[in-house]
Each structure stands twice: as C-alpha cells, then as structure tokens.
C-alpha cells in the first residue's frame, strides 16, 4: 500500500510539473480540487508549493484565482475643447446586470447629451458620482464586475391553463322585492272648507342638497418649478452673450418662390429615384448662402475680441438650426462650397435624424461660420433671429404664403417668403449686409445664377 501511494504521488508531481510548463495534454483543464492561474487570461503566474508526500493532502488543497481585470472602472469620455463639464443622469443602479454597449448613464453637456455604454457584460458594483453631479473628461463614473455572458432576459410569465369550469348551479330564487322607499311626502287631503291662512307654495325637502366644492367654483390655480437643464442654461447664456457683445442689426427682403417650386415639382421624382432623397427648399438656401458668402467674405469672418483682429475664414461651414424636445441644436454642414444639392440634402437628413434621436456628437456642432434658422416650418411669417456667437450673421427663413405682388406692371398672386439677415454691425456695414441678402434672393429665385456665377 505504501509503495502504491508513493507511485501515485510521484505520478501526480510529474503531471503537475508538466502542466505548469504547458506540456500537459489536458490543456487548461485543472485537476479536481485544484485551481490554477496559468494561461493567456492571467498576465502573472501564481506559483503553488504542494507537498507531494501524500496524495490525500493534495486532494483537499484549494486556492482561489482572481483575475485583475474582473473589476474595471469606467471613466467619462473626453469632451471637445469647447465643453468643460456635464451633468450625470443615471440609467442603472448598483447591482444591475448590464450587457455590452448597454447605456449606463447619460452626461448632459452644454451642447448635447453623451451616452456612456457598458464596455462589457457585467454587474454594476458602485456609482462613483451622484445623480445630477458634475463631471469633467476622464472622471471615474462607475465600477463594473465583468461576467462571462450577457444577463439573461426575463422570460414572460406563462399564463396558467384555464381550469375546468364547473357547471353553473341553478340560480336561487330571487329575494322578495324590498318595500319602496318614500321619496316624497304623502299627499295632504284638501279640506272641504277653504283655509283661512295662505296656502303653502311647496313642501321644503327634509335634507339640504350638498354644497358645491369651493375650489370648483373658483377654479384651480397652481404652479410648479422645474430646474433648467444644462442645455437650456447654455442657450440662455449664449443668447445673452450675443446680445451684450454684438451690435445686432437686421435687414429684410422677400423671395419669390415660384421658380424654385416649379423646379422642385418637375425634378423631385427623378431626384428621389437617383439619390433616394427628397428635394426640399433648405438645400437651395444653403447653397445660395454659400454662394453669397464667397461674394461677401466679411460676412463669413469674425472679430477676435482678445487680439482685436478680424479672422477671415477660407472655408464655409453652415450651421442649420434644428428644434428638439431638449432645445435648439445647430449641427454644422462643413465645406458647403464644395457640395451640390444632393450632398446638402443628404447631410441635412443625417444630422436631423441624429438630432431627433439625441445622438448628435459634440463634434457635429463644433465650429460653423454662418447659421440658417427656418422658422417657417412652424408657420412663422416674420422674425428677427439672434446671432449664434462667435459667428457674425444669421439668416432667418419664414413660411411661404401666397400674396399679391406687382410683376411687370400687373398684380399677380405669387408664393412669397420673407427672409431676415441679422448681422454684427461692428464688422459688417449695411451696404455689405443688403448686398449679401440680395445675392441669396437672386440665387434662390433663379438657380441659374449659381451655374453662370453671376
């Protein structure tokens, strides 16, 4: 028996040595009762000293291997240069199981909301920032303990099979009807002789009717307060900054939309078939604005208040205002001077879809040299837009209405749109602003102006 035990112990030692050297034919499977920490998943090898004098002692020897990467700390993603901090709104709580790429929290910045997904399948161990707390780029947000598989989705509860319905018993005999409740006083027999006193006009009820609620008569008046979100605070700050910094002045004109409507009606089907895009009016105004900005480069420039210099931009990046439930956002169409109508429509559709889904990145709204705001989609007839700093001008579009206009000495009904240009009078003179707006008017009313570069 002793010799057999020594043989088994010696064989076990050789097998264990071969296993640690990577020559074990069993691969990475461990022996019963022994947990080993060797393999590509563990960067450092944990050595074990095992007394091979008795196989029974080895049999009951155990160790616990903990991977260093089981618990990870997720940090705030890097923000753009124009964004310094944001507010955290948690979607998950401690102990919740999350799958890879599942949103754990949302960081609301001055310009947009950034979603922070889980980098792996796991369970949230700790939230390092309170709900509503302010964070900067690279701030630790939460710790996650990784698990091997995604959390199983809860199966819908099975509805139990309907039990066998028992035959309804014969209905019992209905109870005898209750005696009717007297709701009126019994009639008073009229006397044979007329009464000496005056007759009673009506019998007063024994109980007075319930009084109506005082609140219902006067009407309810209440109010409640909601904290401004960070985006609304930033919008208010920037608008007030523009009002305090810029010398804003607005000039107006009107655009005859007859030709552009006719062109759209004639080519919209072919445009949709070739580009898989609907041809709208915004692309015409964006392209016309780029054409006018090239003719009047001072409108595309900006004043650097720190150095007291005028910065002229050789590129044209046009911001298009998009209304969302959270507020107004202005994604940027870059290098518009190199685009055609199809490129502009495609970019507008992509940015608008991302804005409605709250998926705009901060980079999508950085920069911009000129802004277009279309209040006409809401039925606005007339308005004066506010400059989007640090830009120097903004174009306001409005609704299209049929109006009588004088054309060639005759009165005709034409589809007309009012347009407004608000500009920084510190940099742009009135002559340049009016010339710029007339260029836009000419390019929209007759797109051949763009082809002929007139």
Curated annotation (Swiss-Prot):
Transit peptide: 1-68
Pfam families assigned to the protein according to its UniProt record, in alphabetical order: 2-oxoacid_dh, Biotin_lipoyl
Lipoyl-binding domain sequence ranges: 71-145
Molecular function in Gene Ontology: acyltransferase activity; dihydrolipoyllysine-residue succinyltransferase activity
Active site, renumbered: 425, 429
Modified residues (N6-lipoyllysine): 111
PROSITE patterns assigned: BIOTINYL_LIPOYL, LIPOYL
This enzyme's EC code(s): 2.3.1.61
Alphabetical list of SUPFAM superfamilies matching this protein: CoA-dependent acyltransferases (SSF52777), Single hybrid motif (SSF51230)
PANTHER family xrefs: DIHYDROLIPOYLLYSINE-RESIDUE SUCCINYLTRANSFERASE COMPONENT OF 2-OXOGLUTARATE DEHYDROGENASE COMPLEX, MITOCHONDRIAL, DIHYDROLIPOYLLYSINE-RESIDUE SUCCINYLTRANSFERASE COMPONENT OF 2-OXOGLUTARATE DEHYDROGENASE COMPLEX, MITOCHONDRIAL-RELATED
Role, per record: Dihydrolipoamide succinyltransferase (E2) component of the 2-oxoglutarate dehydrogenase complex. The 2-oxoglutarate dehydrogenase complex catalyzes the overall conversion of 2-oxoglutarate to succinyl-CoA and CO(2). The 2-oxoglutarate dehydrogenase complex is mainly active in the mitochondrion. A fraction of the 2-oxoglutarate dehydrogenase complex also localizes in the nucleus and is required for lysine succinylation of histones: associates with KAT2A on chromatin and provides succinyl-CoA to histone succinyltransferase KAT2A.
Subunit architecture: The 2-oxoglutarate dehydrogenase complex is composed of OGDH (2-oxoglutarate dehydrogenase; E1), DLST (dihydrolipoamide succinyltransferase; E2), DLD (dihydrolipoamide dehydrogenase; E3) and the assembly factor KGD4. It contains multiple copies of the three enzymatic components (E1, E2 and E3). In the nucleus, the 2-oxoglutarate dehydrogenase complex associates with KAT2A. Interacts with ABHD11; this interaction maintains the functional lipoylation of the 2-oxoglutarate dehydrogenase complex.
Name the UniProt record assigns to this protein: Dihydrolipoyllysine-residue succinyltransferase component of 2-oxoglutarate dehydrogenase complex, mitochondrial
Annotated source species: Mus musculus (Mouse)
Lineage of producing organism: Eukaryota, Metazoa, Chordata, Craniata, Vertebrata
């Amino acid at each position: 028996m002793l010799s057999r035990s020594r043989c088994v112990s010696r064989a076990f030692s050789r097998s264990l040595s071969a296993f640690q050297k990577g020559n074990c034919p069993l691969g990475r499977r461990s022996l019963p009762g022994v947990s080993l920490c060797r393999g590509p998943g563990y960067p450092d090898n944990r050595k074990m000293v095992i007394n091979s004098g008795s196989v029974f002692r080895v049999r009951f020897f155990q160790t616990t291997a903990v991977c260093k990467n089981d618990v990870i700390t997720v940090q705030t993603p890097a923000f753009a240069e124009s964004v310094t901090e944001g507010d955290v709104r948690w979607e998950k709580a401690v102990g919740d199981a999350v799958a890879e790429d599942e949103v754990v929290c949302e960081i609301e910045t001055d310009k947009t909301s950034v979603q922070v997904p889980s980098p792996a399948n796991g369970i949230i161990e700790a939230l390092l920032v309170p709900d509503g707390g302010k964070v900067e780029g690279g701030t630790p947000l939460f710790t996650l303990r990784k698990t091997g598989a995604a959390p199983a989705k809860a199966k819908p509860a099975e509805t139990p099979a309907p039990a066998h319905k028992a035959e309804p018993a014969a209905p019992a005999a209905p109870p005898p009807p209750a005696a009717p409740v007297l709701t009126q006083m019994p009639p008073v027999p009229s006397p044979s002789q007329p009464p000496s006193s005056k007759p009673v006009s009506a019998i007063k009820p024994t109980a007075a009717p319930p009084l109506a609620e005082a609140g219902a008569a006067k009407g309810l008046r209440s109010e409640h307060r909601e904290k401004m979100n960070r985006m609304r605070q930033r919008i208010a700050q920037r608008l007030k900054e523009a009002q305090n910094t810029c010398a804003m002045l607005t000039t107006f004109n009107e655009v005859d939309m007859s030709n552009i409507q006719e062109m759209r009606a004639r080519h919209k089907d072919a445009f949709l078939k070739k580009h898989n895009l609907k041809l709208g009016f915004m692309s015409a105004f964006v392209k016309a604005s780029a054409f006018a900005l090239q003719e009047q480069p001072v409108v595309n420039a900006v004043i650097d208040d720190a150095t007291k210099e005028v910065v002229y931009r050789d590129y044209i990046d046009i911001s298009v205002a998009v209304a969302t439930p959270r507020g107004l956002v202005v994604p940027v169409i870059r290098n518009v001077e190199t685009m055609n109508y199809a490129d502009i429509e495609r970019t507008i559709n992509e940015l608008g879809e991302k804005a409605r889904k709250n998926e705009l990145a901060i980079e999508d709204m950085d920069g911009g040299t000129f802004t277009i705001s279309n209040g006409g989609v809401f039925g606005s007839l007339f308005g004066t837009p506010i400059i989007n700093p640090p830009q120097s001008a903004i174009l306001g579009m409005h609704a299209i209405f049929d109006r009588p206009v004088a054309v060639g000495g005759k009165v005709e009904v034409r589809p007309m749109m009012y347009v407004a240009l608000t500009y920084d009078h510190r940099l742009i003179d009135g002559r340049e602003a009016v010339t710029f707006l007339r260029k836009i008017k000419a390019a929209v009313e007759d797109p051949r102006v763009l082809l002929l570069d007139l």
